[in-house]
Amino acid sequence: MTIDEIYQMYMNDVYRFLLSMTKDKHLAEDLLQETFMRAYIHIHSYDHSKVKPWLFQVARNAFIDYVRKHKKEVTISDDLIGSLFQNAVQSPAHQVEIKEVLTGYMSELPDNYREALTLYYLKELNYKEASHIMNISEANFKSVLFRARQRLKALYNRGVNDE
C-alpha cells in the first residue's frame, strides 16, 4: 500500500482523532500533516495488516510531542462524554447540562484515562488496537478503561451530590 492510498483511506479518521484531542481545527490539520510526513518517512517499518493502529500511533506521538513542546492542556470532546452517560439521561436539556459538567471533570482525569476513553468510545477501536496505540497490554488497557469509567462516574456523582 502506498502512502497516497493510506492517506486517502485514513486521512479523515486520523483528522477526527487529532481534532478530538486538540479541539482546534488548525492544530489538528498541522498535526495531520506531521503524522503523514512521519508515516512517509517510516513507511517501510509498519505491518501492512495493521495500518490503522500504526497510523493512530504515529498521530498520537505527534500530538504528544506537540503537547510536550507547548505545555498545552488538551481536553476530550463533548461527544465522547455524552455517549458515556447517554443511557442515564432522560431529557435533552439534562443531557446538555451533564455534558458541560463532565467536560470539566475530564480535565481532572489522568492523561492515560482520557486517552483510553477517546480511543475506545470516540474512535471505536477494539481493545487490541487501542492497547497497541497506548503501548500497553490488552489486559492493562481493559483495566485502565475500567478505572477511567469509574473515576469519571465518581467525579460526576460527587458533583451531583454536592449540589
From Swiss-Prot:
Span of the annotated motif Polymerase core binding: 30-43
Keywords of the record: DNA-binding, Sigma factor, Transcription, Transcription regulation
Gene Ontology MF: a single term: sigma factor activity
DNA-binding residues (ranges): 127-146
Family as reported in the entry's similarity comment: Belongs to the sigma-70 factor family. ECF subfamily.
PANTHER family associated with the record: ECF RNA POLYMERASE SIGMA FACTOR SIGL, RNA POLYMERASE ECF-TYPE SIGMA FACTO
Name under which the protein is recorded: ECF RNA polymerase sigma factor SigM
Organism: Bacillus subtilis (strain 168)
Native organism taxonomy: Bacteria, Bacillati, Bacillota, Bacilli, Bacillales
Gene that this polypeptide is encoded by: sigM
